[in-house]
Amino acid sequence: MAEPETLPGRWLPECACLAETVSWEQSRLWSRLLCRPHFRHALPGLTGGSASRPSARSARLVRQPRMTLFSLDHRDGVDARC
């Protein structure tokens, strides 16, 4: 599968800095998990905090889910923006 940089429209501008280090399949998995209410428990490492004591960054991610990695892959019907 092509790298994220070659898939126009599938990465939000805020995510461009992560495109080189995160694979497309990882981003699809994360986008689905991050839309769930307890994503901090599922992915404590990704949000930079622990499940019991979330960091300030993870608290921002909760309030502003659009700032996280999200798949905009309409081909398979996925639009994970919360």
Swiss-Prot record:
Keyword terms: Toxin-antitoxin system
Biological role: Antitoxin component of a type II toxin-antitoxin (TA) system. Its cognate toxin is MazF8.
Assembly with partners or alone: Forms a complex with cognate toxin MazF8.
Name of this protein: Antitoxin MazE8
Species whose genome carries this gene: Mycobacterium tuberculosis (strain ATCC 25618 / H37Rv)
